[in-house]
């Protein structure tokens, strides 16, 4: 069909309207100025420059001393307060050490050097705050995208506008072209393209139709969508992103904990060394001023400021970057564990495959007792509350065939075994071949030999039929598996509860040579533990309830975004985009973060060692010591902030190909 100019304009109008309604972030300059430490650091810098100009132009000494002292107050009051609070808690931190060094510089008449120290120290602190703020704001800004109101469709078909926060699971809402989606849900009717870059990082709108999942805060395109709310507003993907970032910021990495453990001892040792540098030369008749100058220089250059900033900013930046691209990482500890991955263990259904299996065959054991239609009806009734992809496929096929699905009660899913429920007065079970304990069934052999997945339907404990289901490999599976193999010490291993034939069929197509099939959940745990006992750091990737125990046992675990709730809670990370190629990418990003941490620690240690040796065995000028020490701190902070950029994500994705 050819669109007229009017039709083209109408089709594009919603996206134009959305661009005006979505809140734009502050400009870079305004965002910087909103950080308190940036404002004080700027004031300190201006006062320092004013004092320097006055000093160089021969102004009265009282003038430039006053300006430098004002610089002390503007740039140093925050650090002085933090240091005092630490001292009250019987701790010694770098803030107090820097203030002590600056005061010492004033005491020996080196107010210029002390003011320079204050300015650079305040600047490095502001950079750290900017990194932390940007890490949080890059993700928390998503909350601003969630609309305040929603249009609920009531039982009589009328519409009512309510607050989005009042929506409950099961509510039906309508989203018109250009509107933002008010809650996580599923499409009941309608079709449209949804711009979900704010959640998944996808650059192009994604086609949505009946049954597809949508996220709160994403933007509807040119069609009208009728949705059912599937998550409470407090549990939407957007809300979980914010919660996970907050948790990640509060959870310190192992490297950071080690640094903090030795920081107190190091600081006390440094103070003792500074006192020794003062007392010992004076005992041998040295002049006070040069002794104090050397000691103050030592205190400045030996302070572990850059070491303290070396670890957490890069890790938190990596977490924020991953979150912007649809991967939620729950803590800095997880980033370190992902970087250590030496083997990836993959589930099959819903992870390596699309997770949208299709019911291929319905085989009643005795058509005179239960025909194919009744068999599928009972199976769908038992599975209608299931979260497993196989269960959803059975229900979907029954609906496609127009079969009325009766209500069921007392539903229970047994991981790795199947489900059972009471359908009317009938006790219906859907069992896997591995958990089935009845007489051998001839109907299983052709299904299993073809690589299909079989499900046995039992009525009151007696087998009445066999269902055959097939699944499709994810489009990016082959490339992703190859990338994982290239990144890790060992190629990926496939862990599945499915039969060996089905597992090997999928594995061969994906390029996997190590397959462990027909595993119950506890057997998956055993395989993971055996791999780790052999020296591997296992990353488990899965989506089903039966993957949760193995995820808990693995070194790290990532859940595919369409997975069951228990799996999402157990995993260390979640891929919202539900795309397998994000797994090698997040491993690559974690390794980038680890390299940045290593480089930062090397930079910090090198600067400290060189400057300390120069001061002890040479004549290190105090201004040069200040610039060298604080310059390394600024350099470390800026290096960590590199991981916030899209370029870092693209580099990780390229390395994973």
UniProtKB/Swiss-Prot annotation:
A Gene Ontology cellular-component term: plasma membrane
List of residues binding Mg(2+): 543, 547
Alphabetical keyword list: ATP-binding, Cell membrane, Cobalt, Magnesium, Membrane, Metal-binding, Nickel, Nucleotide-binding, Phosphoprotein, Translocase, Transmembrane, Transmembrane helix
Transmembrane segments: 40-60, 62-82, 101-121, 268-288, 299-319, 596-618
Membrane-topology descriptor: Multi-pass membrane protein
Annotated catalysed reactions: Ni(2+)(out) + ATP + H2O = Ni(2+)(in) + ADP + phosphate + H(+); Co(2+)(out) + ATP + H2O = Co(2+)(in) + ADP + phosphate + H(+)
Localization per Swiss-Prot or TrEMBL: Cell membrane
One Pfam family in the UniProt entry: Hydrolase
Gene name in the database record: ctpD
Protein family (similarity comment): Belongs to the cation transport ATPase (P-type) (TC 3.A.3) family. Type IB subfamily.
Principal location listed in the UniProt entry: membrane
Keyword Methyltransferase: no
Organism: Mycobacterium tuberculosis (strain CDC 1551 / Oshkosh)
Active site per UniProt: 347
GO molecular function annotation: ABC-type nickel transporter activity; ATP binding; ATP hydrolysis activity; metal ion binding; P-type cobalt transporter activity
Biological role: Involved in heavy metal homeostasis. Probably exports nickel and cobalt ions out of the cell.
Protein's UniProt name: Probable cobalt/nickel-exporting P-type ATPase
EC numbers, comma separated: 7.2.2.-
Enzyme class: translocase
Superkingdom of this protein's organism: Bacteria
């Amino acid at each position: 069909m050819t669109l007229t100019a009017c039709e083209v304009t109408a089709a594009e109008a919603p996206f134009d309207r959305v661009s005006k309604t979505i809140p734009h972030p502050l400009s870079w300059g305004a965002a910087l100025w909103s950080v308190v430490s940036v404002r004080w650091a700027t004031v300190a810098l201006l006062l320092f420059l004013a004092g320097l100009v006055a000093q160089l132009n021969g102004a009265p000494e009282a003038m430039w001393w006053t300006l430098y002292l004002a610089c002390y107050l503007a740039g140093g009051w925050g650090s002085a307060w933090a240091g005092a609070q630490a001292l009250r808690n019987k701790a010694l931190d770098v803030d107090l050490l820097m203030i002590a060094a600056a005061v010492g510089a004033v005491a020996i008449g080196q107010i210029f050097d002390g003011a320079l120290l204050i300015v650079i120290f305040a600047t490095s602190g502001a950079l750290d705050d900017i990194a932390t703020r940007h890490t949080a704001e890059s993700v928390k800004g998503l909350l601003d995208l969630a609309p305040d109101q929603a249009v609920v469709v009531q039982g009589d078909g009328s519409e009512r506008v309510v607050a989005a926060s009042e929506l409950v699971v099961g509510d039906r809402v309508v989203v018109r072209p250009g509107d933002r989606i008010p809650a996580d849900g599923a499409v009941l009717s309608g079709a449209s393209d949804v711009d979900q870059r704010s959640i998944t990082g996808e650059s192009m709108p994604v086609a949505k139709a009946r049954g597809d999942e949508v996220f709160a805060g994403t933007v509807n395109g040119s069609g009208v969508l009728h949705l059912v709310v599937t998550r409470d507003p407090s549990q939407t993907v957007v809300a979980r992103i914010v919660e996970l970032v907050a948790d990640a910021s509060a959870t310190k990495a192992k490297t950071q904990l080690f640094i903090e453990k030795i920081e107190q001892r190091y600081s006390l040792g440094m103070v003792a060394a500074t006192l020794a540098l003062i007392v010992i030369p004076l005992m041998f008749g040295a002049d006070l001023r040069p002794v104090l100058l050397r000691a103050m220089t030592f205190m400045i250059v030996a302070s572990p400021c850059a070491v303290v900033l070396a670890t957490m900013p890069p890790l938190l930046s990596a977490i924020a970057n991953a979150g912007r691209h649809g991967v939620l990482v729950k803590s800095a500890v997880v980033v370190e564990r992902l970087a250590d991955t030496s083997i990836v263990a993959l589930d099959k259904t819903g992870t390596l495959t699309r997770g949208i299996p299709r019911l291929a065959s319905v085989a009643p054991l005795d058509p005179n007792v239960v025909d194919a239609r009744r068999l599928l009806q009972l199976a769908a009734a038992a599975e209608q509350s299931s979260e497993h992809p196989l269960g959803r496929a059975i229900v979907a096929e029954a609906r496609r065939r127009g079969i009325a699905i009766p209500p069921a009660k007392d539903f229970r899913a047994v991981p790795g075994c199947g489900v059972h429920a009471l359908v009317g007065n009938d006790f219906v079970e859907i069992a896997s071949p591995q958990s089935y304990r009845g007489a051998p069934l001839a109907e299983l052999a052709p299904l299993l030999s073809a690589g299909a997945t079989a499900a046995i339907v039992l009525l009151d404990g007696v087998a009445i039929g066999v269902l055959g289901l097939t699944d499709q490999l994810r489009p990016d599976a082959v490339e992703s598996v190859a990338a994982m193999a290239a990144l890790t010490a060992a190629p990926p291993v496939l862990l599945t509860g499915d039969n060996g034939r089905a597992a090997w069929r999928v594995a061969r197509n994906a390029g996997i040579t190590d397959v462990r099939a027909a595993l119950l959940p506890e057997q998956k745990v055993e395989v993971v533990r055996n791999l780790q006992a052999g020296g591997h750091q296992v990353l488990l990737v899965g989506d089903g309830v039966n993957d949760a125990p193995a995820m808990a046992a693995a070194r790290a675990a990532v859940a595919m975004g369409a997975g069951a709730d228990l799996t999402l809670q157990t995993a260390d990370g979640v891929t919202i985009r539900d795309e397998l190629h994000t797994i090698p990418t997040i491993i690559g990003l974690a390794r980038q973060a680890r390299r940045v941490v290593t480089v930062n620690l090397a930079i910090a240690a090198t600067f400290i060692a060189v400057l300390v040796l120069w001061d002890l065995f040479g004549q290190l000028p105090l201004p040069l010591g200040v610039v060298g020490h604080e310059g390394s701190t600024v350099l470390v902070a800026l290096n960590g902030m590199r991981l916030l950029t899209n370029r870092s994500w693209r580099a990780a994705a390229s390395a994973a190909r």
